[in-house]
Amino acid sequence: MFIKSKGFTLIELLAVIVILAIIAVIATPIITGIIEDTKKESFKRSAEGVVEATKFDIADKMTDSGYTYTLSDGKIVNLNENVKISNSKGMNGSIKYNKDGEVSYAIYNDKWCVIKEGNDVTLSNNIDKCVIVNPYKEEILNGTYPVLDEKMIAITYTEAGIPKVADESSEWYSYASRKWANAVVLVNNPSKTYNVGDEIEESDIAAYFVWIPRYEYTLKGNFGVNGESKTNPGYVDIRFTKVSEESNGTASYTEGNPTNYRTQDAFKFGEENLSGIWVGKFETTGTADNPTIKPGITSLRKQNVSTQFETAKKIGINNSLSLETSMMKNSEWNAVAILSQSLYGRCPSDSTCLEVALNNNTNFITGSATAGSTYNSEEGVKASTTMNITGVYDMNGGASEWVMGVLLDSDGKPRSGYNISINSGFNGKLEDGTEKTDGLALPERKYYDSFTITGENTKVDLMTGCNGGKCYGTVEFGGWYDDGSYSINPANPWLRRGGYYGNGARAGLWFFEGSDGGADGFISFRAVIRGA
């Protein structure tokens, strides 16, 4: 007689093992997830505790524009030593109070990121983009806020005139106070990583840019509001406008009233309406292979127009910008000049508009006023379009500047230059009727402004020479401050602006002259980035 076993058979044992394995497979991620969620929530509570600690300190730090704390490796570097924080090991980020005492923050460790903006709190593992993303927006700009390329760094300046990383969520510009938005592009391998508030080493900067917001303008009489004459003009009436708004008025008052506003031409790029443009703060510097935009060094000259056009591209390409850098057009020069001749530039009151000072440096040193001055000195800022360090420099004197503005031939094609030896380097008709064919093709139409000779004229009439009508932004201001105004004609089909130091009183914001487009030791150029 056999006794029946009460143990598991091999098959049953294997089945149990399989079931347990399945349970483990299912349960382990759940348990791991619970543990991770607990750690994540613990990090969030610790971050909230750090923020809470700043509330015992903010009363002593608050300014009219708010205040921002910096959290670095678990320590708030600008926190009163009597205020203690805990559970903050390895945390970094920023805590920002606005002027009303409302707090936003972005705090991260090696694994988690918590961001609070308004009433919204997000918790993620995206630590590479753990920043407060609500940038400062000046209401007067009507939505035309600075658009930064991901490789650009917003800056302000110390009292000593040294650029430092701006807190984009605080007031880092104010057009109402004639403080224009500035940004820099760093070299590809800077000496360090820069954080908010850090002063930036000049050797780490490849280029400086200034934001020109989209606007429309109109003019009272022939000399602006409160203007008396060309030698003592008044201010241009402008207002900042949304990208969706476009005005095509005659840019002139009606019976003393501000009407007929016109959107400045620079804010149209092909079919695209622009919210603004970034303009090189100084004339282009460096070399043809490695162009820069920097103060205190000689400007890049002795290039024809086509070479300058190609060189301008390299500022963006060499420094890995996603937005394109390009050579400035005539309309873009005008955009800077008109903004400067407004209440947001060099006209701080209804009765005073000061002329941009001449850069009379005979060595073409950028950012100078009188020889020997630097752009960030008391004397140097007189050559700025804002009378302070935030403006654009070298627009009166220094070197003259080629712009992308060209006379069309009778077939509607851009001319090349004077003769086969002296020309822009672009293909096109020459003054003697022959053609240059071994040069570069001109870029798309949106990259240059064009002029035409109408009727029996032998040179461009600025009242009829732009699309059959007025050359807005140029013709209204001819001769202001006694700046030189010279003709564009078949022998001199390319436009240059600003004048060079040797033009003396004839140089200035409103100086314009046709010339041959060739390489010249007295002529530089300027780069722009067209904001999205």
Please provide the spans of the model-predicted regions.
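C-terminal, surface-exposed recognition/capping segments
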Residues: S331-N334, T352, N360-S373, S377-E379, ...
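Alpha-helix exit/C-cap motif
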Residues: E52-L71, S342-C347, T374, G405-L408
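Short aromatic-cysteine micro-motif
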Residues: E199-A206, F240-M395, G531
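Periplasmic/extracellular, small/polar-rich flexible segments of pilin-like filament-forming proteins
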Residues: F56-P135
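Acidic glycine-/aspartate-rich tracts in secreted/extracellular proteins
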Residues: W112, Y215-T218, F282-T285, G405-L407, ...
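N-terminal single-pass transmembrane signal-anchor helix
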Residues: K4-T32
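N-terminal module-boundary/linker segments of secreted carbohydrate-active enzymes
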Residues: I132-T259
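Aliphatic-rich helix starts adjacent to a transmembrane/signal segment
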Residues: S5, I30-V51
